[in-house]
Amino acid sequence: VDKMNITNSVAPVISHWANYSHGLDALLDIWNVVLGLAVFFLARMLGTLYIINNVADETLRARSRKQLLYNTAAFLLLFLPFLIRTLLKDGFAYDPATGVISMESMKYLYNLLDMWYLSVVLLVGVVLLLFGIVRTVMCNNYIKGIWPAGIGVVLVVLVLLLIAGWNNTAYYPSNVDLQSSLTIANSCSSEFTLTTMSIVSLFIPFVLAYIVYVWYAMDKDKITKEEVKQGDVY
């Protein structure tokens, strides 16, 4: 990272890759692969829950419940070790007074404990996710598991992102030069840009409301075999 390079009118780039792999060397870290596989099975879980909620076919729903159980087991076997390892590993602490980045034992666990409200959000997210999955598997007449599970996933992912960047933490550590790790402080935009983004963010509730309305309009009628057989199919 070289912030002075922003004065270069030809190439005002303040950061660059340290080698020609352009970040692909991250694949050599087995834990990144574990996380990627966990996300893969999580996507399959949510997709299965969506099918159960939106396809009016009991045979397909029964098969989907079995697939949900298998994918949930695979997800937990991958995600739980990753989460435990992340909370117990050394983290990248940032000193706001000096700008120095250093290693700190169990930094992410301490972030979770220091910001107790994130712990509450994490707990709520986990409970919602488990509720959506368990009730869908155990109750044949329950089809709305996508809603609590989906909300739970959003909350858990949000907490993981925040403990990786808040509380003076480098969210994108450098494997080559520790002091070149990216933090919120050294990678944020100018005050003008941040002010503009803050104003634009006021419209987010309206965007979310539109998304909710559109999804409701699309999903209020369940998909049936007759619908698939007749008319245009997309």
Regions found by a protein language model. Give the residues of each.
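Short, highly charged, low-complexity non-transmembrane loops/tails of multi-pass membrane proteins
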Residues: 220-234
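Short, membrane-exposed interhelical loops at transmembrane-helix boundaries
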Residues: 100-106, 172-194
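Membrane-interface transmembrane-helix boundary segments in multi-pass integral membrane proteins
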Residues: 106-120, 186-202
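Long, contiguous internal "core" modules enriched in hydrophobic/ aromatic residues
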Residues: 1-142, 159
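Alpha-helical transmembrane segments of multi-pass membrane proteins
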Residues: 39-42, 156-163, 203, 207, ...
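Juxtamembrane non-transmembrane "cap" segments at the membrane-aqueous interface
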Residues: 2-11, 158-179
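Central hydrophobic cores of alpha-helical transmembrane segments
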Residues: 146-155
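Membrane-helix cytosolic exit motif
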Residues: 207-223
